[in-house]
Amino acid sequence: MAKKVVKVVKLQIPAGKANPAPPVGPALGQAGVNIMGFCKEFNARTSDQAGLIIPVEISVYEDRSFTFITKTPPAAVLLKKAAGIESGSGEPNRNKVATVKRDKVREIAETKMPDLNAADVEAAMRMVEGTARSMGIVIED
């Protein structure tokens, strides 16, 4: 018989930098998960993506075991890295903070494809472009 999922915990953690301190420790401690076991496994799995924030979905079972799925980094994080900026614009309709080439947007869309609800790369590109616009980033051809 399959194990029963008791709780699903969603977190966004910097790649390779999970530790028992907040926010990871309290979230997993409440679910009764072995925190150090999760941290070691997560850090090993994400060590090649240093510098990015990785969303993770942890399924906790009734016997306190767990499995987790790492997702692709948020589009905003990938756009900030591509544009070389620290944060988006506070007033994206007035202040533009950076420009990104369309081929870079395509690259980000292809990276995000598994997690986006898009039929093709063109649709994924439109989603990423919308995120860029709301951050005050201009898309160039």
From Swiss-Prot:
InterPro entries membership: Ribosomal_uL11, Ribosomal_uL11_bac-typ, Ribosomal_uL11_C, Ribosomal_uL11_C_sf, Ribosomal_uL11_CS, Ribosomal_uL11_N, Ribosomal_uL11_N_sf
A GO BP entry: translation
Subunit-structure text: Part of the ribosomal stalk of the 50S ribosomal subunit. Interacts with L10 and the large rRNA to form the base of the stalk. L10 forms an elongated spine to which L12 dimers bind in a sequential fashion forming a multimeric L10(L12)X complex.
Post-translational note: One or more lysine residues are methylated.
UniProt keyword terms in alphabetical order: Methylation, Ribonucleoprotein, Ribosomal protein, RNA-binding, rRNA-binding
Entry function: Forms part of the ribosomal stalk which helps the ribosome interact with GTP-bound translation factors.
PROSITE patterns, A to Z: RIBOSOMAL_L11 (PS00359)
Name by which UniProt lists this protein: Large ribosomal subunit protein uL11
Keyword Metal-binding: no
GO cellular component: cytosolic large ribosomal subunit
GO MF term list: large ribosomal subunit rRNA binding; structural constituent of ribosome
Record-linked Pfam families: Ribosomal_L11, Ribosomal_L11_N
Entry-linked Gene3D superfamilies: Ribosomal protein L11, C-terminal domain, Ribosomal protein L11/L12, N-terminal domain
Organism: Bacillus licheniformis (strain ATCC 14580 / DSM 13 / JCM 2505 / CCUG 7422 / NBRC 12200 / NCIMB 9375 / NCTC 10341 / NRRL NRS-1264 / Gibson 46)
Gene name linked to the record: rplK
SMART domains: RL11
NCBIfam families assigned to the protein according to its UniProt record, in alphabetical order: L11_bact
Entries under PANTHER family matching the protein: 60S RIBOSOMAL PROTEIN L12 (PTHR11661), LARGE RIBOSOMAL SUBUNIT PROTEIN UL11M (PTHR11661:SF1)
Family indicated by similarity: Belongs to the universal ribosomal protein uL11 family.
